[in-house]
Each structure stands twice: as structure tokens, then as C-alpha cells.
Design a protein with these regions (language model features):
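A generic structural motif
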Residues: 263-270, 296-297, 333-338
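Intrinsic, low-complexity N-terminal interaction/targeting segments
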Residues: 212-219, 242, 276-320, 325-327
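A glycine- and small/hydrophobic-rich beta-loop-beta segment
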Residues: 191, 197-290
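Conserved glycine-bearing catalytic or ligand-binding loops at nucleotide- and phosphate-handling centers
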Residues: 173-178, 183-187, 191-201
Length: 346
């Protein structure tokens, strides 16, 4: 009854706080505060439950140590300093509980990490404390060699290099956000992806090790837009590519693939929010052609240039598909192909 009463008081406290926002203008600040309440309530409830079970758990509020800088990027120095100090204050604890996703910004306001959610929090925490391993539990047995929502009878990939995992995450593997890999990679901490529904399954281990000369997986990214700028007059001029890329930067639109020729530049994007404005600005430099509903297929593995034959095998596998662009060389871990299709399943 004691813990049940504490849980009721916890929920009431947070709901009363949310109700205060109904009396004033609802701004972006209030929205972020409301979004944080789920993490705050669930972790508080879990901590009470564990205490009731006799486990000496301690709740460490993420809002006391997780902070972003003025560029909305995590501040690893601040996070490490504050978190270690908080942990040192509870040396007798059996278990620590904290929130994912939420943080404070550089001005002390409640905010969130925006990308990667709780997985990003786990990676940042693991890096801050120098963990032996970071575990991320999901509803699937690690990263698969194909998207199980599209391809039947896929199988988990047991080992991936940090770069391979980042490529798969960026090009369609929904199990992990590419941002989550970086803190672990910078601190050389292995990341293990495990399945909550099958805790005995080995999952996927992500580290700085790779299996040489092996293709690991294929990912697909749909709803891609291809933009081609054709300009024989401007292409060889100094600074032409910089000017083209600056247009995309001005509209905060990331580029997925780039290819160049003597008379043109082709790029792909997956964010069409500012497509019209981007095209208008690009027309200053040449003729612009836009193709929508494209798909990027990304083949990931140890694809260094001295591993002869991989590129030919990949292209041969796509012999019946009209490939529009091929990107290879920017990374030793992927080959990307662009083609027209209504869906990656096709």
C-alpha cells in the first residue's frame, strides 16, 4: 500500500503539472515539457516497483545531467561530469534508472535529443561512464541482412563494424538511428542489439571489428527525389559544386548520393519540404530535372577496393533493373544504387 500510494502521488503530481498548461498559451516550450512526462512517469513507477520488490534501485533524473549545447548537440563533457558525480553519490545502489530522449538545452529548458530517442541516450551514457558494453533492447533480434518487413526469411547479422551499422541505419534499418552509433564509436564501446521478446537470442554486436571480404546486408530507402543540374558552361568553373551544395545547406536538406560528369551533377534527397525553393535557386546554374518516387538500395559490407569482384556482382544482380545512379568510393563499407520503383519491395 505504501508504494501504491507513492505511485498515485507521482502520477497526480505530473498530471497536475500538465493541467497548468491549459491556462496559458501553448508554446513549443510547453510541448516539450508535456512530451517529457511519459519518460518521467514511467521511470518513476519502475523505480517504485523495484524498491517494492526489495531491489536497491536509484532514480537518476536525466534532466540533472543530460544537456545539449547552443547547436542542439549533446555536450559530452558536461554530461560526463554531472553523471559521474550523481552516480558517485549512490555507491551502494544495485541498479540505476534514468530517462531516455529527454534533456535540458543550453538555456536550462526541458528539451529532447530529437534524433535517435532513448537509444541515443544509452550511447551517450555508455560513453560518459566508459561502459564495457552498451545494450539496446528492441522488438527484433538485431539488425537483419534485409528488411524483414519487405523480404521474407531474413536472418540477423551477428557482427557489424560501426561504419557498417551506421550505413544500414541511415539507409533504412529502422532498428537503430545512425546518430546513436557515434558516441560508442568515438569511445570504442561495443553496442549489442537484443530482442526483448527473445532475450536468449544473441542479437547483433556492433564494434570496430569486421569480417573481411564479406557482404553483410542490404537496405532500401524509398521516397527518394533525384535532382540533376545540367550545365556545361558552369560545371568546370571554380566553386560550382560548392555553390550547389550551399543551396541544399541553406534549406537544411541533407544529400544522400552525389554523382558528377563533364556536363552535370546529380544528387538525391529524401526531404522534399523545400524542393520548390531548391529547384528555383539551382536554375541559376543550369537546367534542372527532378525525378520523384525513387529508391536507394544500399549494399553494406567490407567493400574495400582490393576486394575484387563485389561491384560486378552487385551490378549483375541489378541487371534487370534500370539503375539511375551508382555511388561507390566515399566509404569502404557501402555501394548505393538509385532506381525507379514505386516501393523497395519491387
Amino acid at each position: 500500500d505504501e508504494y501504491k500510494q507513492k505511485a498515485k502521488e507521482l502520477i497526480k503530481h505530473h498530471f497536475d503539472h500538465i493541467r497548468t498548461f491549459t491556462k496559458d498559451l501553448f508554446t513549443l516550450f510547453e510541448e516539450k515539457v508535456v512530451l517529457a512526462q511519459g519518460e518521467l512517469i514511467s521511470t518513476g513507477m519502475m523505480n517504485l516497483y523495484l524498491n517494492e520488490c526489495g531491489i536497491n534501485s536509484v532514480l537518476i533524473p536525466a534532466l540533472d545531467y543530460m544537456r545539449t549545447d547552443k547547436n542542439a548537440e549533446p555536450d559530452p563533457v558536461y554530461i560526463k561530469e554531472k553523471l559521474i558525480k550523481l552516480l558517485d553519490g549512490h555507491k551502494d545502489a544495485d541498479l540505476f534508472i534514468t530517462q531516455g530522449y529527454i534533456c535540458r538545452n543550453a538555456y536550462g529548458e526541458i528539451d529532447n535529443l530529437q534524433r535517435g530517442g532513448s537509444d541515443y541516450s544509452a550511447s551517450l551514457i555508455g560513453a560518459a561512464i566508459g561502459a564495457e558494453e552498451i545494450q539496446i533492447w528492441t522488438d527484433i533480434d538485431g539488425m537483419h541482412n534485409n528488411d524483414p518487413r519487405i523480404v521474407e526469411k531474413t536472418s540477423p547479422v551477428r557482427h557489424l563494424h560501426f561504419e557498417e551499422a551506421a550505413e544500414l541505419a541511415y539507409f533504412g534499418a529502422k532498428i537503430l538511428h545512425p546518430t546513436c552509433i557515434l558516441p560508442a564509436k568515438l569511445n570504442n564501446i561495443p553496442v549489442r542489439l537484443l530482442n526483448t521478446m527473445q532475450p536468449e537470442a544473441p542479437g547483433t554486436m556492433i564494434s570496430n571489428m569486421t569480417e573481411k571480404g564479406k557482404i553483410k546486408a542490404v537496405a532500401a530507402k524509398d521516397n527518394i527525389t533525384s535532382i540533376k543540374i545540367k550545365s556545361g558552361r558552369m560545371l568546370l568553373a571554380t566553386g560550382f559544386l560548392r555553390k550547389v551544395f550551399e543551396i541544399f545547406e541553406n534549406y537544411q536538406t541533407p544529400i544522400d548520393m552525389v554523382t558528377t560528369s563533364e556536363v552535370g551533377v546529380s544528387v538525391t534527397i529524401d526531404n522534399r519540404k523545400h524542393l520548390e525553393e531548391i529547384v528555383d535557386d539551382l536554375k541559376k546554374y543550369g537546367t534542372v530535372t527532378v525525378d520523384e518516387d525513387m529508391v536507394i538500395v544500399c549494399v553494406v559490407g567490407d567493400l574495400e577496393w582490393d576486394n575484387v569482384g563485389f561491384e560486378a556482382r552487385i551490378v549483375q544482380a541489378m541487371k534487370d533493373v534500370p539503375v539511375r545512379m551508382i555511388s561507390y568510393g566515399g566509404s569502404n563499407y557501402n555501394v548505393c544504387l538509385l532506381y525507379t520503383s514505386p516501393s523497395p519491395r519491387d
